[in-house]
């Protein structure tokens, strides 16, 4: 058969080489196609995602649930009495060691401006004995207790470096004595009680006021005493009448009854009258100024009896009742004997 082919195997027409034809390539194996996932979520996932968009649900999941689990675990762990006692004891021991460190200890107390009685009372009010931890001393409560002392007006408490508890005390200054049914007490300028005394001679340098409610009107009483001026040497005190007004008590049993209002102005008028007329040097027992438009003067017993004798009337006794004629004659004889 080769002889029948005028061309060579490798030659084409005209003696040219025949083109080489590549063998067809075998197709590559095709991998099995995986089914595509449906991008749409399920109803449950959709609802969960929508719920997580709510702030309350997010906080509940991120904070509430972990906190609940932690509390549950802690509660189970602390349900055992032994573990709970050990934990409490350990915490108390740590706190005690910290509070009793040397830098927190108060070793001494200094008090300034207090009398010996107040100094002793203030030291007795300390809740603990020194040295003690500063955590055991509540300065605010201690200050409230100290201020309950009648003699203390103010107190400044502080813990200074070096473990020193400092107390600077300002005591009340007594300026007047107050006599009442329960005894005699010292009052300051505001009428606050300072201390009790057994008799007026303990503080004879102070003026005295008397009567129920006089302590509440002490500032007014002090103003009246300051205004007494010329009659101050004769002043024995002020008496509160009916918790409404004052009576100025002088020696020889004389009284100046002051009104409920404008008592200071009324006393100044009485002093002016006395300076002009020497009214209080006469036998007058009461000067009644309760009515501004109509002052009243009450004569003393001797002046009244002298007038009654001139009129031929029986004399009056100390209680204001007329005496018998015999007693009147006896008194007249005694008076004549004295004058002779």
UniProtKB/Swiss-Prot annotation:
Low complexity bias (residue ranges): 324-333
UniProt subcellular location: Cell inner membrane
Residues on Periplasmic side: 79-340
Stretches assigned to the POTRA domain: 104-172
Transmembrane segments: 56-78
Membrane-topology descriptor: Single-pass type II membrane protein
Domain of life, per lineage: Bacteria
Region (Disordered) residue spans: 1-41, 308-340
Cytoplasmic compartment residues: 1-55
Record keywords, A-Z: Cell cycle, Cell division, Cell inner membrane, Cell membrane, Membrane, Transmembrane, Transmembrane helix
Keyword Cell inner membrane: yes
Family as reported in the entry's similarity comment: Belongs to the FtsQ/DivIB family. FtsQ subfamily.
Function: Essential cell division protein.
Protein name: Cell division protein FtsQ
Source organism of the structure: Paracoccus denitrificans (strain Pd 1222)
